[in-house]
Amino acid sequence: MALFRKKDKYIRITPNNSLKGSVSQVIPEVPDELFAKCPACKHMIYKKDLGLAKICPTCSYNFRISAQERLTLTVDEGSFQELFTSIETKDPLRFPGYQEKLQKAKETTGLHEAVLTGKAMVKEQKIALAIMDSHFIMASMGTVVGEKITRLFELAIEENLPVVIFTASGGARMQEGIMSLMQMAKVSAAVKRHSNAGLFYLTILTDPTTGGVTASFAMEGDIILAEPQSLVGFAGRRVIETTVRENLPDDFQKAEFLQDHGFVDAIVKRTELRDKVAHLVAFHGGGQ
């Protein structure tokens, strides 16, 4: 009877010994540079879908971008003239491993230091421009960063130019000790001289802007803009919670929180910053 028919045996498959070895020989690998994981929504994104502005298509998170990428998004093509490239740190404290760290940062970013400075045109408005790059030792402010920004303000005074700075920093550069902290006062004094000359100063806070940069020139602009969801603060969240012994709001130190409390004038989408900068510079009688 069919009910008691002997079951057929399973098909036997002889393993292919040629496939033995590393997994990479069997499973094709997807190159890491093709995809990026959004830190906010955790989605995996095909990098080409981020566009030049590097904005997550799912949650609109703004990825951190380099100074060169920021330059491309902001200024008129071919208008940027880089300045003060010959200034280099002398490692005043002979801090162990500092020179090696500097060299690696230079090779990785293609920059001489953590800030790119120069003159440029934004929709035919001439400006003195500084762009900080968090990929260079977290854009920490040392003597060279302070000197370059100070010289930029001095040049702007001489040439009657508005100053526009895109800030991003982890704070003062610990490898240079007290000399890095002195840059806060040094740059702030230059900002004051520029203001006394009746010239316009615009700051755009990007993620992250913290420490001594926040406590000095980042918050001294005549108008202060910020990119959405940028981290902006002085001390770290855990330090503050330990000090005040209170739990802080989830959005504490976010750009939107600062705007709600009067520290930021406006939150501007990255794709709209070029137009906004040009409009504000022109409105305040900026460079022609």
Swiss-Prot record:
SUPFAM superfamilies, sorted: ClpP/crotonase
Primary location: cytoplasm
Annotated ranges, domain CoA carboxyltransferase N-terminal: 34-288
Protein keywords: ATP-binding, Cytoplasm, Fatty acid biosynthesis, Fatty acid metabolism, Lipid biosynthesis, Lipid metabolism, Metal-binding, Nucleotide-binding, Transferase, Zinc, Zinc-finger
The EC number(s) this enzyme carries: 2.1.3.15
Entry binding sites for Zn(2+): 38, 41, 56, 59
GO MF: acetyl-CoA carboxylase activity; ATP binding; carboxyl- or carbamoyltransferase activity; zinc ion binding
Cofactor(s) demanded: Zn(2+)
Catalytic activity: N(6)-carboxybiotinyl-L-lysyl-[protein] + acetyl-CoA = N(6)-biotinyl-L-lysyl-[protein] + malonyl-CoA
Localization in the cell: Cytoplasm
Zn-finger region bounds: C4-type: 38-59
Biological or metabolic pathway of the protein: Lipid metabolism; malonyl-CoA biosynthesis; malonyl-CoA from acetyl-CoA: step 1/1
Stated family: Belongs to the AccD/PCCB family.
The name this protein goes by in its record: Acetyl-coenzyme A carboxylase carboxyl transferase subunit beta
Source organism of the structure: Streptococcus dysgalactiae subsp. equisimilis (strain GGS_124)
